[in-house]
């Protein structure tokens, strides 16, 4: 390590310590009343991760059922039962009410509602989502509904290779129509798709997510088929066209009478330069264009970012004039799932390679903490990659404010994970999570005061759930779930008690005595 690097790291550590001290003092008096009156606080989950009942009442497999049953998640975990919300939704809604949230972010399982992906609607699936939505509303909780959250119907995957085919756009629009028609009288906040800027990379470049398509030498896992140099861009294009098609349908057919809002939800890593070398600064900006701008640029300006057009070339699909017009401003809000900052450096040599995937086109290199080796998780994944970097949230929101016309933003996911109690018991003490959430809620308020148009914040997650590749090794829940119990017993963690107190008017960072009992934190 060079002396300059040592000095740089020492400066970063000192600045971080000073920032933490300042944060503790400035946030002490913050309460919910400091946020705009209509600001929404909530918590979330998604269908495959929380529902269970994977083969009950007419539901058919999604690509995540196929993937997890093939053993690709840690410990061979699946979402077959998970937290069993399908059978316990009334209990869960009562917990949400007790916590005092304004809203619950949920998703609909396409293969539960329309088991074959198109055609007949499953009456039992329709009944379940009607019951859940009605239960939420009867307890004063707004349903914020995602139409597609990774769980694509396996039937359509088998029929035409799923999202890789343009046929997906028509089928998704028809599925969205069923959702709007049956639930839109009560659902006023719709997200079309969740994290469409990560599914193409994980599923069609690296092969670590379903449907496991990739090509040598880019796949993290070996894949039977795919093309990592082209398919991620095709899939992202189809997701964007499907989103805009569903938005057009909603606006033309439903919005005037139902009075709801519609958008989509992006993953919002923030890319930061690893050094202040101009090439590294440019690399971070380029990576933010490839990550956030991949969707925001078409939504705000009608086409992909110029740097993507330049670097990807003919492999990047083009919009027709009609498609560009439809994509442009096809949102009332944009959701962001934000957790961490990632540091990158330039690697312009990648642009000289004859074969390039997404990372090659971005021409950056980075050492993601979750690519460390010699750990217990598959694919080099570790549990410590979500360190607290609230400054990154502020930078991301400022970026949206300055570059993308300051859209209405809903922070749809933000949270911290812990591992299960090694003794086999239930982990109640999760003060690290409370601290993490306090940091990010304060950062959200600071961004609002700086002019960002943030209108909601949702903790990920309401309950412990099936965390995809991590299975049940990572627990994000405000409420824990005893997965060893057939009843999937819920239990309140310290963070749930703190969040409830804050939502009832308590201070963001209460004194220990306040948390011990009495007042807003008495639950």
Swiss-Prot record:
Q: What class of enzyme is it?
A: hydrolase
Q: Where does a beta-D-glucoside bind?
A: 49, 149, 194-195, 339, 413, 460, 467-468, 476
Here the disulfide bonds are 214-223
The EC number of this protein is 3.2.1.21
Is Hydrolase one of the keywords? yes
Which InterPro entries does this UniProt record tie to the protein? Glyco_hydro_1, Glyco_hydro_1_N_CS, Glycoside_hydrolase_SF
- Signal peptide limits: 1-22
Any one GO biological process: carbohydrate metabolic process
Under Gene3D superfamilies, the record lists: Glycosidases (3.20.20.80)
> Which residues act catalytically here?
195 (proton donor), 413 (nucleophile)
**Which PANTHER family does this UniProt record tie to the protein?**
BETA-GLUCOSIDASE 31 (PTHR10353:SF317), GLYCOSYL HYDROLASE (PTHR10353)
The entry's family comment says: Belongs to the glycosyl hydrolase 1 family.
- This protein is called Beta-glucosidase 31
The gene is BGLU31
């Amino acid at each position: 390590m060079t002396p300059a690097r040592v000095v740089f790291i020492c400066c970063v550590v000192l600045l971080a310590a000073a920032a933490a001290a300042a944060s503790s003092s400035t946030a002490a008096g913050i309460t919910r009343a400091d946020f705009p009156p209509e600001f929404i606080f909530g918590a979330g989950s998604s269908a495959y991760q929380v529902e269970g009942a994977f083969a009950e009442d007419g539901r058919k497999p999604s690509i995540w059922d196929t993937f997890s049953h093939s053993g690709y998640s840690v410990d061979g975990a699946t979402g077959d039962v998970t937290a069993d919300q399908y059978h316990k939704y009334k209990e869960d809604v009562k917990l949400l009410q007790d916590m005092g949230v304004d809203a619950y972010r949920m998703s609909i399982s396409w293969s539960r509602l329309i088991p074959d992906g198109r055609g007949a609607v499953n009456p039992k699936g329709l009944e379940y989502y009607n019951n859940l939505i009605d239960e939420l509303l009867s307890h004063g909780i707004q349903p914020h509904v995602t139409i597609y959250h990774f769980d694509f119907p396996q039937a359509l995957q088998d029929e035409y290779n799923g999202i890789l085919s343009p046929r997906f756009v028509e089928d998704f629009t028809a599925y969205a129509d069923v959702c709007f028609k049956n639930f839109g009288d009560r659902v006023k906040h719709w997200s079309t798709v969740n994290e469409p800027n990560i599914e193409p990379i994980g599923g069609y470049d690296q092969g670590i997510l379903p449907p496991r398509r990739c090509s040598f030498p880019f796949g993290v896992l070996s894949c039977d088929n795919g093309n990592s140099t082209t398919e991620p861009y095709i899939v992202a294009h189809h997701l964007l066209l499907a989103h805009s098609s569903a938005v057009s349908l909603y606006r033309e057919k439903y919005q005037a009478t139902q009075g709801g809002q519609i958008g989509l939800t992006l993953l919002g890593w923030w890319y930061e330069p690893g050094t202040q070398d101009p090439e590294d600064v440019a690399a971070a900006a380029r990576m933010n264009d490839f990550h956030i701008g991949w969707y925001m640029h078409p939504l705000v300006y009608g086409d992909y970012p110029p740097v993507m057009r330049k670097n990807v070339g003919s492999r990047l699909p083009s919009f027709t004039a009609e498609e560009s017009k439809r994509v442009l401003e096809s949102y009332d809000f944009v959701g962001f799932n934000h957790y961490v900052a990632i540091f990158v450096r330039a690697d312009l040599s990648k642009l000289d390679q004859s074969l390039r995937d997404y990372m090659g086109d971005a021409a950056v290199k980075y050492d993601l903490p979750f690519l460390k080796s010699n750990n217990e998780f598959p694919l080099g994944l570790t549990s410590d990659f979500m360190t607290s970097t609230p400054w990154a949230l502020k930078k991301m929101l400022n970026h949206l404010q300055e570059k993308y016309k300051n859209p209405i933003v809903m922070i749809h996911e933000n949270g911290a994970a812990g591992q299960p109690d090694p003794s086999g018991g239930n982990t109640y003490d999760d003060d690290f999570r409370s601290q993490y959430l306090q940091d990010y809620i304060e950062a959200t308020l600071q961004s609002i005061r700086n002019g960002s148009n943030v209108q909601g914040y949702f903790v990920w997650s309401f309950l412990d759930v099936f965390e995809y590749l991590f299975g049940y090794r990572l627990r994000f829940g405000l409420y824990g779930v005893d997965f060893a119990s057939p009843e999937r017993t819920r239990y309140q963690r310290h963070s749930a008690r703190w969040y409830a107190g804050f939502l009832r008017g308590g201070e963001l960072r209460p004194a220990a005595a306040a948390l011990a009992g009495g007042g807003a934190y008495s639950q």
